[in-house]
Amino acid sequence: MNSESSKQKQAFALISLAGIFLALFACLTALLLNYDLGAVGPENSVVGFSTVNKFIFDKLGQSDFWYKLTELIGYFAIAVALGFVVYTAIELFRQKSIKKLDIDLSVLIIFYIIVALVYLVFEKALINYRPILVDGKLEASYPSSHTLLTVFIMVTTIVQLLNRVHNRPLKTALTAIAVVIAVIVPVGRLLAGVHWFTDVLGGVFLGLALSLCYAAFCKCIPDCE
């Protein structure tokens, strides 16, 4: 009973944190459409928080090294997600029934779909453009998709590692790698100069909101330790 009560408290704390990050994302998005709008982007494209964004972009500049590194890490994160999709498909085939499939795996796939849909929505619902031209054209920039996807995938991967890997040294090592990746991509995208500061911040907020929702759900599953 004490263990179950503890898990419920942890789930409540996680969903509360998720709500905070989602609220921060919503506030940031609304402010980007209204606060300190300035034509500081390429081809005089307008950006919210223009003073802060331009200051940080001018100070950090651009880095081809960080761009290539974060691109590679982004592909690795997607490969990790695909690995979970394949593992879930194998388990589904082995169990021969979706009802016998571990709930945390089923819900993880649902969350992957949600994140993919969110990505597509923001590709169409333009908030602002990148601080650079891509192939000579303006491109949607908010939130940073690399940041959103990597933060979400790595945090949910940590949840899976904690639940499924029983070798403590291996679990610790893999979790540490996931944390490093989740941190280095947002920082790297900013240093690469391919996103405004608020793009990266929005990606972090939304990635954490969605991944913490998933973590909270897992805490509510009786057999998910």
Question: PLM features: what roles do these ranges have?
Answer:
Residues 2-80, 123-134:
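N-terminal transmembrane-helix/juxtamembrane module of multi-pass inner/ER membrane proteins
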